[in-house]
């Protein structure tokens, strides 16, 4: 796997245990909103069973002017995450591989979109909505249900910025029952006149896919993010 070098410029603590790593863009490197890449850190001592590469979604867009990934670092974490938390500093180099994935909005094919995101699964959604903010589609309505059981939400300022985008509604939810109820209500009301994007852990993606299909939503209307990096 070939890696290009990006320079870390800033680390932002988004929540009590989630951090964004912001980097320069290597000349000639491009990507589409919703894609993920392999990131590589070198020069740090890692556990023998650990590796220096992880897949994370690119949470920024080309228009942002920087590369960014966001990851959760729990109390119990790998030596890779320990390097991110306590060792890596602005000015250090991070390897970036070729972008992968096709997780995207279809604002031309549908009049409505429901986005269901849980926890750190919000990262591709941030990129998709950032791109949509620059190029909104007239008459298209997007509803975002972003849930975190602890009530800790990444990108707080970004959600305020989205309030200016016509047709975009964001609900920040900290109650799991409300999260599921709001999803059910939307699916029952809108049915297959919308596309449904799900971004969370593999378990959440599977559970909500089954839930939506049980409410009559066609499989082809449901997209799930490949949640590789934690």
Enumerate the language-model features and the residues they cover.
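Ferredoxin-reductase
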Residues: 2-90, 148-150
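FNR/FR-type flavoprotein reductase catalytic core
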Residues: 78-230
């Amino acid at each position: 796997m070939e890696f290009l070098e990006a320079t870390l410029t800033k680390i932002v603590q988004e929540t009590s245990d989630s951090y964004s790593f912001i980097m320069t863009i290597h000349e000639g490197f491009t990507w589409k909103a919703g894609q993920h890449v392999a990131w590589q850190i070198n020069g740090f001592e890692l556990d023998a069973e650990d590796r220096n590469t992880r897949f994370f979604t690119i949470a920024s867009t080309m228009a942002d002017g920087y590369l960014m990934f966001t990851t959760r670092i729990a109390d119990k974490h790998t030596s890779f995450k320990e390097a991110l938390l306590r060792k890596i500093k602005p000015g250090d180099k991070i390897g970036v591989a070729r972008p992968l994935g096709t997780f995207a909005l279809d604002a031309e094919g549908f009049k409505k979109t429901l986005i269901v995101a849980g926890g750190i699964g919000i990262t591709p959604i941030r990129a998709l909505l950032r791109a949509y903010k620059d190029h909104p589609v007239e008459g298209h309505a997007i509803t975002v249900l972003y849930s975190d059981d602890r009530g800790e939400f990444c990108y707080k300022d970004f959600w305020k910025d989205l309030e200016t985008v016509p047709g975009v509604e964001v609900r920040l939810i900290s109650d799991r029952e409300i999260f599921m109820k709001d999803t059910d209500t939307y699916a029952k009301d809108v049915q297959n006149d919308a596309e449904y994007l799900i971004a969370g852990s593999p378990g959440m993606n599977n559970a909500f896919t089954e839930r939506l299909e049980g409410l009559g939503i066609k499989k082809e209307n449901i997209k799930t993010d490949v949640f590789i990096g934690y």
